[in-house]
Regions:
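Alpha-helical segment proximal to the catalytic Tyr-Lys
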Residues: 130, 179-180, 246
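Short, small/polar-rich loop/turn modules that mediate ligand/substrate recognition or access, typified
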Residues: 182, 187, 248-250
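Substrate-binding pocket helix/loop in short-chain dehydrogenase/reductase
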Residues: 101-102, 106-114, 218
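Conserved glycine-rich cofactor-binding loop
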Residues: 11, 18-19
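Short C-terminal tail/terminal secondary-structure segment
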Residues: 2-4, 238, 243, 249-263
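Short, flexible catalytic-loop segment of classical short-chain dehydrogenase/reductase
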Residues: 193-203
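Catalytic loop of short-chain dehydrogenase/reductase
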Residues: 137-169, 174-183, 195
Length: 263
């Protein structure tokens, strides 16, 4: 029972790991002894975040930038990760959103969101299955954690007509993948975050992407009276990645301060 929540020595890939929720999870993994790869579309940002996280938390944080909205980028990332001998944890966090009024909502916006949030998750998981299969055992399965959203459970507040739909699809994809892979010692679950101080939420509430804004107006509307913290999301990801979470399969777990429960 002593090491129930240990991820010491595990190898993890966190997509969308250069900022926001992905960065929070990557930081939590590093602080608890995992070797972490982070990926994002912008190489300079990804490199800078990996360097900063490694300096702050120690361990090994490796930047592997790629665009995961298309198969070329997915294949390139899988090839980079395959240079390691195995992969214990895959966090599919890379995501996109697009906001326009319904009468103006474009095919470009629809496809960008669906390609990144649904198709990209499936095909990256597919390409990394050999490594995940190699790492997983009956006692300590490999883990896939898909980052969904409460907007895939309840109606969202913004004119992002493909975002919530993509996350609802991701939640169902999580169940399908979990049923398919559980007997191969690969466990798949999803986390549905609520409000966290991220670039994406900041753009939606008029903050222009600045994460250092006053979040109290958002936090005050939350049942817990605040927005989420890195400890909240990283703690849940660590649970799902550790021995403690080895019997939790195919679930979408909200991390939202009670928003969905109170809606």
């Amino acid at each position: 029972m002593k090491d129930l929540f240990s991820i010491e020595g595990k190898i993890a890939l966190v997509t969308g790991g250069s900022r926001g929720i992905g960065e929070m999870i990557a930081a939590g993994f590093l602080a608890n002894g995992a070797k972490v790869y982070i990926s994002s579309r912008k190489a300079d940002v990804c490199d800078a975040t990996a360097k900063r996280l490694q300096e702050e938390y120690g361990g090994e944080c490796i930047s592997v930038p790629d665009d995961l909205s298309n198969l070329d980028g997915i294949n390139a990332l899988a090839d980079k990760i395959s240079q390691d001998d195995n992969l214990d944890i895959l966090v599919n966090n890379a995501g996109a959103s697009w906001g326009e009024p319904i009468d103006e909502y474009s095919e470009q916006g629809w496809d960008k969101v669906m390609d990144t949030n649904v198709k990209g998750v499936f095909f990256l998981t597919q390409k990394l299955l050999p490594l995940l299969r190699k790492s997983g055992t009956a006692e300590d399965p490999s883990r896939v954690i898909n980052i969904g959203s409460i907007d895939g459970i309840k109606t969202g507040l913004f004119d992002a007509f493909s975002y919530g739909q993509s996350k609802a699809a991701l939640h169902h994809l999580t169940r399908v993948l979990a049923a398919s892979l559980v007997k191969e010692n690969i466990i798949v679950n999803a986390i549905a975050p609520g409000p966290f101080p991220t670039w994406m939420l900041s753009t939606g509430v008029g903050g222009g992407g600045d994460v250092d804004i006053d979040w109290s107006s958002i936090g005050d509307t939350n049942p817990r009276g605040r927005v989420g913290t890195p400890e909240d999301i990283a703690g849940l990801a660590i649970f799902l990645s550790s021995r403690a979470g080895a019997y939790t399969v195919g679930q979408t777990i909200t991390c939202d301060g009670g928003v969905v429960a109170s809606s």
